[in-house]
Amino acid sequence: MQTRKQKMIPRGLRNNNPLNIRIGNTWLGEREHPTDGEFEEFVSLAYGLRAALIILRRYIRRYHLNTVRLIVERWAPRNENETEKYIQFVCKDTGLMPNTTIQYEDEKTMCKLVGAMAFVECGQRIEKDEIIKGYSLA
């Protein structure tokens, strides 16, 4: 049972899953006894960020979803989200244009992208050092 204080922490941060990845794959760093039932739970924020970065890289490499617009439209579909506002925020926060091509091996851009997306998903900033840890694990 969660305490009131724990419930006040955004779900993505409670689960160390700042991009709110739904349960599906088996990930390195998953919690041994998850309780969420809908979203992945990781042992640390770095592992949750690692999983998010792996998915985003896959979007770019395999599916050629290589712009903020294409990535966010896949990640946060219009039937569940305010996708256009999500895109606008990520672009403003990262300095990227919606249709600028993103290179998956560009650490700085990928870290900015995942940081901005995490803010949209959880409403809180993730420390840059944590994002870099996740990137180094990915």
Residue map of PLM features:
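Cell-wall polysaccharide-cleaving catalytic domain and substrate-binding groove, primarily
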Residues: M1-A138
